Amino acid sequence: MVRPVSRSDQAADSIVRNAMFAGASKLSGAAFTAVLTIFLVRYLGPEEYGVFALALGVGGLMTVPADLGISVSVARFIAERRGDPDAMARFASDAIRLKIFVTGAASLALLVVAGPIANAYDTPDLAWPLRILAVATFGQSVMIMCATIFEALGRLSVYLRVVLAESALEATGSIVIVLLGTGATGAMVGRAAAYSFAAGFGLVLVARTLGRSIRPQRGGHGHARRILGYGSALVIVDGAFTVFSQIDVLLIGAILGVTAVGHFDAAYRLAGLLLFIGGPIRSAVAPRLARGEGGPDREALELTLRYLVLAQGVILAPLIVWAEPLTRIAFGTDYLASADVLRALAPFALLSAISPLLAGAANYLGAARRRVPIALFTLAVNAAIDAALLAQLGIVAGAIGTDVAYVIYVGAHLHLCRDLAGLRLRPLVAPLVGSLSAAAVMGLVLLAFGTGADLAVPLVVIGGALGTAAYVAVLLVTGQVTREERTAVWRRLRPAA
């Protein structure tokens, strides 16, 4: 039985509160992921970690067939019906029913083809990690749907509990199991157990938040066709983007081998740990673009994009200037070959701040079909550059392909949001110039401390703090942050009287 729901349970939180809790979810997950990734990279070594990374890359291709656009599609319909818990619960119930069949079938398919895939890569040790990943895929897909539902409800504070549970279980469980000598297979067992628990926990919290039963009903509530209808376009978009995120790993594995995969993936994940801003902001802002009561909130989108452009530039200088010391500190000297990849991924890192928000806004605006050609074209560009340059340039070619394709992807989504929500692009030019100028000054500060791989950790900490201060100072001096904005921030930060 579902407990009675209070008005506060159903009311959506503010953008700031949702962003804070989404950020906390992302940051806590990133912290656990950082610990686990560094442990696995160091303990397993490049070859065995390469097997683990390749398994995740192959399994990542199952993300789309395991979802069929259900998660984002149901989130859109729920966001359009805020204030009607009965309608929201019916959509959630039908989505869960679809998930059981769709995700279950995809996981079973991965289980069946694990052996042939391992043989195709001439890596027998890949088979069991893939088989166990089939279980993790089911739990992860259900957990993702719970995330989108809480996003649509504007109750990301509740979802934080799910993230903490999954992240803690995966990190601790995987480390303990790997220490028993189970290698990449053991790491995958920890992942599967954590996602399975998180999936069940997330569904319980969704039901409690709505105060309604979301148990799937025989025959459903009549929303399955609508969910799958909008999801059909999202399947193509998500499929292309999923392949986009894995194509570098897959092509590097096929052309250069699993050790090269380990070096590339380590740098890619390190860059990803710095990119936690875009996702939480998307979760807080994008649902407000749904065409429900009040219509798309263009002002929220414009203001958020401005702040993202100003803030995200702070990561450029460390990625470019300190690629070697950051790689050595995180992964050790065996991974110094990853430094060039980390440096080359700097443009991708910058664009990743605003990309999730733009994509999420388009989805809630009901424009999934217009995103299809954008996604397919950027995937083709990335794959073409990789195929053409990997043999000549090595793993850095993967970063180049990602950068070029992402420039196209983000630019196209900016124009899409302009057409659908009236987004004004000119006001973003000044913040971008200011951010790049501040990053250049920050880079000079970091250069003063040295760039060698042997740079001491205390110097990295001190230099990073001074460089960040220089970055903020440039934004203030150039007027990118107004007096009113500084006053508002101070009011939020100062202690209550």
Where are the regions that the model predicts?
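Signature of the first transmembrane helix
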Residues: 11-71, 103-111, 136, 170-171, ...
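Membrane-water interface segments that mark the loop-to-transmembrane alpha-helix transition
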Residues: 13-33, 55, 68-115, 128, ...
